[in-house]
């Protein structure tokens, strides 16, 4: 299947100054509801990483999970979650986060191995605060981050520069 940049972009909606002033919300729900677009997104990531040395995908909940699950399946690698809240009584690493809707991110202490080469997966990169916090969690577990990927990156919000300041490559499927 050929990647149709126009189709993908037509299914992404940007809401500026929502949920608060100075913040943009990117709605990807139409991508998930279009089988053709969903397949293009998944195939785009799988083709990009099929020959990469990826041992595990670590995805940030919630909106990244359906996409990351399909990419992990396509690459035949395990999928781990970074959560916004502790869900079980197990031991978790915690990193404080300056996000709007939650104060910290968590990953189970036994989720990643020190030998893992991780693809960190988020749905949208805006300011870079979430990928900064998530990358600190992955590194705390001892794993190495191969790259960060996202479906959409907004260049005017600082996230691309934030990834560079963390000395991490960022692969956005779509940039605005």
Where are the regions that the model predicts?
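Active-site-facing substrate-recognition patch
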Residues: 1-53, 111
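PRPP-dependent phosphoribosyltransferase catalytic core
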Residues: 2-5, 10-11, 133-176
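Short glycine-rich phosphate-binding loop at a beta-alpha junction
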Residues: 54-63
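Conserved acidic residues
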Residues: 55, 116, 146
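Generic enzyme active-site microenvironment
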Residues: 59, 120-121
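Short Gly/Thr/Asp-enriched flexible loops that form oxyanion-binding sites at enzyme active sites
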Residues: 66-76, 135
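Short, glycine/charge-rich flexible loops or terminal/linker lids adjacent to PRPP-binding catalytic cores
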Residues: 77-119
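Conserved G/P- and acidic residue-centered "switch" motifs that form tight phosphate/ATP-binding loops
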Residues: 123, 128
């Amino acid at each position: 299947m050929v990647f149709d940049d126009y189709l993908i972009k037509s299914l992404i909606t940007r809401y500026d100054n929502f949920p608060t002033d100075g913040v943009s919300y990117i709605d990807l729900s139409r991508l998930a509801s279009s089988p053709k677009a969903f397949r293009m997104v998944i195939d785009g990531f799988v083709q990009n990483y099929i020959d990469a040395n990826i041992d595990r995908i670590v995805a940030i909940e919630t909106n990244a999970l359906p996409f990351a699950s399909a990419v992990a399946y396509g690459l035949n690698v395990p999928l781990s979650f970074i959560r916004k809240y502790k869900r079980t009584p197990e031991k978790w690493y915690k990193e404080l986060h300056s996000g709007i809707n939650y104060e910290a991110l968590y990953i189970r202490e036994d989720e990643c191995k020190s030998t893992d080469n991780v693809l960190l997966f988020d749905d949208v990169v805006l300011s870079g605060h979430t990928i900064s916090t998530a990358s600190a969690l992955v590194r705390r577990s001892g794993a190495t981050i191969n790259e960060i990927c996202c479906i959409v990156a907004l260049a005017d919000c600082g996230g691309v520069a934030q990834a560079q300041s963390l000395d991490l490559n960022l692969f956005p499927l779509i940039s605005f």
